[in-house]
Amino acid sequence: MNSAVNDCLLIKKSPIHNKGVFARNNIASNVKLIEYIGRKVTKKESREIEKKAISLSITDKSLARTYIFKLDDDFDIDGDVEGNDAKYFNHSCNPNAKYLYEHNRIWIVSIRNVRKGEEITFNYGFGFDEDFKDHPCKCGAKNCAGYILDEEDWPKLNRATQQRRQRQQQELSLENEGANKGGQRTSASP
């Protein structure tokens, strides 16, 4: 079901993930699209919400959703509240919007011209930490990093991927050497 948010935004099924936000009309660059609203929570509460979503996702992947937005070093915004249509913006490695902190409020702002019917996305900016693999990216962009990461962390991901490939190649070489040594035939003279 499609649902109009305001004069320029529409929520509908997304090819990226579940629901997404789409342009109802052409939108110019640098336009405030919508405010991200929610309940102010402590970092501890935020972690508990995320843990609960992860544990629920073990049995049902559709339950693996949180709408936590970092506000500052002490607090986050839990956007899983009625009326927060901004929670439906999906991540993309090639976004056409960004988030903007302004006077203790979070806005989603276009960063280029957006065509009518185009899905509006922003880079969620997750950090490259121990759980980055829990956040695979499905944006489909040509420059997709494969994981939902801040663009600044893509070089770290590339280095880690290269190191993993090198280790795998070394392990494979060692396995092949061992197989060749163990499987060598010696000829015995009668």
What are the residue ranges of the model-derived segments?
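C-terminal SET catalytic tail plus cysteine-rich post-SET Zn-binding segment of SAM-dependent SET-domain
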Residues: S92-P190
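Catalytic cores of histone-lysine modification enzymes
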Residues: N2-Y99
